[in-house]
Amino acid sequence: MTALGITVALLVWLVTLLLISIWKHIHSSWKLPPGPFPLPIVGNIFQLDLKNIPKSFTMLAERYGPVFTVYLGSRRIVVLHGYKAVKEVLLHYKNEFSGRGEIPTFQVHKDKGVIFNNGPTWRDTRRFSLTTLRDFGMGKQGNEQRIQREAHFLLEALRKTHGQPFDPTFLIGCAPCNVISDILFRQHFDYNDKTCLRLMSMFNENFYLLSTGWIQLYNNFSGYLRYLPGSHRKLMKNISEIKDYALERVKDHRDSLEPSCPRDFTDTLLMEMEKEKYSAEPIYTLDNIAVTVADMFFAGTETTSTTLRYGLLILMKYPEVEEKLHEEIDRVIGPNRIPAIKDRLVMPYLDAVVHEIQRFIDLIPSNLPHEATRDTDFRDYIIPKGTVVIPTLDSVLYDSQEFPEPEKFKPEHFLNENGKFKYSDHFKAFSAGKRVCVGEGLARMELFLFMAAILQHFNLKSLVDPKDIDLSPIAIGFAKIPPHYKLCVIPRSQV
């Protein structure tokens, strides 16, 4: 065949592909929400900024409204933007959109655990996990004592910095890591423990990689990209290593299990596995238990650690806020008493600051992907089963009608005219509905108590002028990743 013939054949193929794509789009989208026209193979990839997909969603919402459709490759995605649409999907249609959209980088977790799972296995595992965590003190006195005990170790580690500059990533991260480790395994790590540091390093690296443009691309075009070199290989290697660690700990627990005296969360899951010993379709397999534990270890460590780390940077940017916090802590708690969760009721400013930190950093801007579990009539549209559904949390947390000047850090967003704490129904940092964060109660408690303990004993000192601190995230994707920085903590007794 001549070069001209090849060129003509290629053009005919491309035109045919385009016509087929147009026909499919018209045929399948007549009852879908509106959205930009997708190209063959790539969909709407060229209309999205892979380094800031949440911003792209906001721009598309301005054109197409609060409910719109985009395609990433052949993957159909319905995006919900704004408080009303997001709340409607998460709370009023919580069954119809309770599925978890596929995330190829977490393939090793597919059909297991409490985050990336679907169907009966997910429902039973999640329900049992919530009940068991309550029994082990989730959000109650048992966990308060855990956090207070860990705050002591955190303060000791901070004192050992002797006022010198340090990177807070792993030092601060050890505190929530140890809290969740105690719940899962009844294990406490030294702050220099190599295993703990390795785990936190992988958690931290995964959080960053998941937020890069390449992983956004990979998760939507994995069929084409899986055999290429790239950071997806490192991410999946880390995920497998974390799962292997969890499986090893689960097997250790199995070999020393005393059913009459469960030690921790892992023991209770193993006891359920024993009950299903003769079941033809057991839910609590070793693999499912290991992935459940790995899910909770990763989420329970990295999200709280990142929020604390971002929060300290924000307080250095706004020293007047830190000064008000010191005043409230001194007045309510004093220099010696351990902060308690009951203090939250009489410390509206700290409560407001903790909420505003979470709102401002908007840690998981696009939520985790949901999925339609059945063909669903939603407003004037039909959303087919299997459609990925994204209820954007940033559109709620940055709603200018609820939070005036949302791009500014203002604790007053959560204070009324009398200086009392003001709850907002727009505060959806943990999502809502059937996929709400399992560890919400624990995370809220940790953020309040750890922040109170740190500021009770230390002043924060930036290495640069506060006005030169840049709060912009270094990556925006799965999460918003804070910039790297160092700080000094100065014992307040020396001030």
Swiss-Prot record:
Belongs to the cytochrome P450 family. It catalyses: an organic molecule + reduced [NADPH--hemoprotein reductase] + O2 = an alcohol + oxidized [NADPH--hemoprotein reductase] + H2O + H(+); (5Z,8Z,11Z)-eicosatrienoate + reduced [NADPH--hemoprotein reductase] + O2 = 19-hydroxy-(5Z,8Z,11Z)-eicosatrienoate + oxidized [NADPH--hemoprotein reductase] + H2O + H(+); (5Z,8Z,11Z,14Z,17Z)-eicosapentaenoate + reduced [NADPH--hemoprotein reductase] + O2 = 19-hydroxy-(5Z,8Z,11Z,14Z,17Z)-eicosapentaenoate + oxidized [NADPH--hemoprotein reductase] + H2O + H(+); (4Z,7Z,10Z,13Z,16Z,19Z)-docosahexaenoate + reduced [NADPH--hemoprotein reductase] + O2 = 21-hydroxy-(4Z,7Z,10Z,13Z,16Z,19Z)-docosahexaenoate + oxidized [NADPH--hemoprotein reductase] + H2O + H(+). One of its GO terms (cellular component) is cytoplasm. Pathway: Lipid metabolism; fatty acid metabolism. The keyword Nucleotide-binding does not apply. This is Cytochrome P450 2E1. CDD domains: CYP2C-like. It is an enzyme of class 1 (oxidoreductase). The omega-1 hydroxylase activity is stimulated by cytochrome b5. A cytochrome P450 monooxygenase involved in the metabolism of fatty acids. Mechanistically, uses molecular oxygen inserting one oxygen atom into a substrate, and reducing the second into a water molecule, with two electrons provided by NADPH via cytochrome P450 reductase (NADPH--hemoprotein reductase). Catalyzes the hydroxylation of carbon-hydrogen bonds. Hydroxylates fatty acids specifically at the omega-1 position displaying the highest catalytic activity for saturated fatty acids. May be involved in the oxidative metabolism of xenobiotics. It comes from Sus scrofa (Pig). InterPro entries: Cyt_P450 (IPR001128), Cyt_P450_CS (IPR017972), Cyt_P450_E_grp-I (IPR002401), Cyt_P450_E_grp-I_CYP2E-like (IPR008070), Cyt_P450_sf (IPR036396), Cytochrome_P450_fam2 (IPR050182). One of its GO terms (biological process) is xenobiotic metabolic process. It is a peripheral membrane protein. Interacts with chaperones HSP70 and HSP90; this interaction is required for initial targeting to mitochondria. Its EC number is 1.14.14.1, 1.14.13.n7. Its cofactor is heme. Heme binds at C437. GO terms for molecular function: arachidonate epoxygenase activity; heme binding; Hsp70 protein binding; Hsp90 protein binding; iron ion binding; oxidoreductase activity, acting on paired donors, with incorporation or reduction of molecular oxygen, reduced flavin or flavoprotein as one donor, and incorporation of one atom of oxygen. Substrate binds at F298, A299, G300, T301, E302, T303. Keywords: Endoplasmic reticulum, Fatty acid metabolism, Heme, Iron, Lipid metabolism, Membrane, Metal-binding, Microsome, Mitochondrion, Mitochondrion inner membrane, Monooxygenase, NADP, Oxidoreductase. It is found in: Endoplasmic reticulum membrane; Microsome membrane; Mitochondrion inner membrane.
